[in-house]
Structures are given as structure tokens and as C-alpha cells.
């Protein structure tokens, strides 16, 4: 399968891609390499992933509609996994434009690319904020 993973240099993206590469999947990873998290850590993760011939990286911001359209038009993805986001409720209040660009505009570009190119499966990460205020120490599948 050919799989697109957005946010590939992040913690979850990096570890997911390592597992997918262990299964001999073909992975195209994209990340904007912004400074929300340590850029050197992101680059070190990418250096490890690039050792596998089934991985290729493109520095693309998912909010860039034309770059995303070109990426989808030039690839036939079987699966798209969207892990690119600006995380954190506090950050969204302090930096609303960056939050909207990544989490709304960017995600819409992922959705539209997937729709127009007839991607079979789309997986996206949500937020722990969807659980609301929880008085317990942890959430269960029944909460």
C-alpha cells in the first residue's frame, strides 16, 4: 500500500511510520518542520526514517492548498493518515491564526485531496479535549 502520513516528524508520526515500514509499506511523509516542537529532534527522526528506501519525505505545510493538490495529484494513495496539527487548547487561544491554518484549513486540504483522488481510507487524530472535563484520573472506553 502507498500511505501518506502528515505530521511525520512528530512523535506519533515517527513511531507509526517505523511500524509501517516494518510491514514493508510505502510511505510518503510530509511535515512543515515548524518550531512548535524542537526542529532538531524532528530532523533526527527524519534522518532515521530516510534510511529506509520505502520512505520519502516532502517538507509541505498542509495549509498550502496548491502544494497539497500537487502532492495528491502526483500520487495514488491507498491510505491517508493525518497527524499534522497545532496541539493544545491554550495554544489555540494564544495563536488562533496558526491553529486555524493547521487544524482547519490544513485538515480541509487533506480531506479535499482525499476526496478528489478517491483515497480508500482516511485516518485522523483527534484531541483529548473531546473528552471534556473528566473528574477521574483517566478515561475509559465507556466514558
Task: Name each model feature, range by range.
Residues 1-143:
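N-terminal Rossmann-like NAD(P)+-binding domain of SDR-like oxidoreductases, especially those catalyzing
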Amino acid at each position: 500500500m502507498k500511505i501518506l502520513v502528515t505530521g511525520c516528524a512528530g512523535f506519533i508520526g515517527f513511531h507509526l511510520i517505523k511500524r509501517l515500514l516494518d510491514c514493508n509499506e510505502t510511505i510518503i511523509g510530509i511535515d512543515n518542520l515548524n518550531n512548535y516542537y524542537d526542529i532538531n529532534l524532528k530532523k533526527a527522526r527524519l534522518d532515521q526514517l530516510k534510511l529506509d528506501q520505502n520512505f520519502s519525505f516532502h517538507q509541505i505545510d498542509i495549509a498550502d492548498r496548491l502544494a497539497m493538490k500537487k502532492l495528491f495529484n502526483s500520487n495514488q494513495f491507498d491510505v491517508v493518515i493525518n497527524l499534522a496539527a497545532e496541539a493544545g487548547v491554550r495554544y489555540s487561544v494564544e495563536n488562533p491564526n496558526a491553529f486555524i491554518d493547521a487544524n482547519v484549513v490544513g485538515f480541509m486540504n487533506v480531506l479535499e485531496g482525499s476526496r478528489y483522488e478517491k483515497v480508500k481510507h482516511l485516518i485522523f487524530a483527534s484531541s483529548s479535549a473531546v473528552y471534556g472535563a473528566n473528574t477521574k484520573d483517566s478515561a475509559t472506553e465507556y466514558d
